[in-house]
């Protein structure tokens, strides 16, 4: 009750709040029915509990292109909530739902924008995910690539252009670091360290991660190496989806070959209960781990 009332307070445009209890499957099926009746339901779940309702997302909401928005609290690593509560599966799972769009905001302003944008979509499901606790500090973009809102990719760092070395930048393709959602700060920290060492590097953050934006594919194909950092399952996650999209572009008559893609994320195993910081360090997903992976990629792509 407290959870649903707080949601109602945050979204005064809501007509009503329905607490279905611990019945995620029913919540999704009921929301599809509400959408068919002309409403736009918002379903609030812990990310890990969406797993048990995947069939309803796929067959009741996705198949019928119902305008339902799902907001996933505690997405990514939750640490001391316990091994069962890590919301690490959603991006890999939901990418298989045709027509579904998923946003992974990196800060509070992005979260608010993503929710507003999701509510404008009435012919497909939308998902907005955010981590446990406070979102990272505001991270303004230098510029935006792609079409807003769903194809927009924010450029957070562009070392060659920022330094005024346009000619050098054009002669040397950059490393591209992609920070998905709450992992954008780690990607940006690694990018700044590489830039300080003289590397040409871009750090970007897609506002909507599923499907992979065309602008992100273009940026990746123009890089000499790509590193994707995400707080979800690495197998089938955003890095895997980007790599597949790049390969499809090559096979469709694009560039002769695609640059290498390194994926940093949660490995395919159950994680022991620990603090979020300890798990990030264990999985080499903290800032030092991301920087080490970026340096290995830079050496490989010299």
Regions found by a protein language model. Name each.
Residues 17, 41, 68, 101-102, ...:
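Hydrophobic beta-strand scaffold residues
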Residues 20-21, 44-45, 105, 178, ...:
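Structural motif
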